[in-house]
Amino acid sequence: EPLWYAKWMQASTTREKYNRGYWLQFYLYKDLENLFIRQGDEAKLRLLNQAYYSGDWSIIAKKGNEGFYFFSDEDVAAIRSSAKTQWGKKIIADLEQKVKERRKHSLEVPKEEGGHFHDYFCPVHNLQFTFRWDKPLAQYCSACDKEWIGNNRYDWAWIYEVHMLNRDYMYQCMYLYLATGKRQYADYIRTMLLDYAGKYAGWFEHNSGRKATDQHSGKAFAQSLDEVNWATKVAMAYMAIKPVLSKEEVKTIEEGYLQPAATLLLHRPAGANWQMWHNSGLAALGIALENDSIVDVAINKDKYGYHYLIGKHKNSDGWINEGSPHYHYYPLEALLFTANAVKCRGIKLFDKDLHDMFVEPVKGT
């Protein structure tokens, strides 16, 4: 007879049993934890932690296409196996070095909204400024050999760079956590996400001129295109560590960042490669929020969803019809992120359309 059940049955009244409900969950958790440890089943241990800390015990029963995740148990097993190979060890070492370098600088999220990448260039030489962590208000051009000071657009673009570097940092930590299981990488993501969650909702919607507008403007960035690119990867990092977050931390991150970001993007209709990236961000946020209605918008919405855009913008020869190789592979990346995100919901987008987009350009047609 399980220990948790014996403890619960010792209560003589319904009220006592109710009051012992917390301990019932605790003993159930410990019994299952011991069982899964004996079985060596890391996948079930992750699900158990997510169920216990979220209070949603139905998670334990979810299998296959019934869950919300970016990496299946098989994916995680493959990542960990690959990380032990000769080439895998090199990748892990590279990621570890990048995370180590990032942690030499401030990890605090900027208090202000970010700007536009196109503003991070010298007005004389059209050369991108050299990013320096300790110079948020002085942007250096190596061709001029001078600092440009007093231009708000340049300084807001510096914040853009910080946000993007933070995205890369959390994405790198995500793969290190999945590959090694080391809790420190989950903690790195947790700390930064909580910081963003505490600031994101308070940022105002703006464009590159710092004007509040719903014409493709963002919050962390000056345009929604950057917003969705950021959300696509950060939502993945969040879901990777969600099983080790407390219920309060999940609530803070979802209400402070994920939900406001989804609300913003649901009201940013665009077209062509922009909307393909919008759908990538919405699909990722929908999975992270476990919200099929958001996923449905990204995939099926008339004039804006994944299927509509494929029909409108994919030529019969496999190319996306925006007139250049760059604007073929750039939106293709978004389509791949979208297809991968929605696999867990039984939505199969790795089909002939995606196949053609890879194969036909290689043929030189």
Identify the role of each PLM range.
Residues 2, 45, 185-189, 294-298, ...:
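Solenoid-repeat scaffolds in large eukaryotic assemblies
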Residues 13-14, 85, 234, 289-291, ...:
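Intrinsic-disorder/low-complexity, polar/charged segments
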Residues 12, 18-270, 276-283, 303, ...:
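Extracellular glycan-targeting catalytic surfaces
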Residues 14, 181, 246, 290-291, ...:
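Residue-level recognition of short, structured coil/turn motifs
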Residues 252-365:
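Extracellular polysaccharide-recognition and catalytic grooves
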Residues 1, 7-10:
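A short beta-strand element within beta-rich, extracytoplasmic domains
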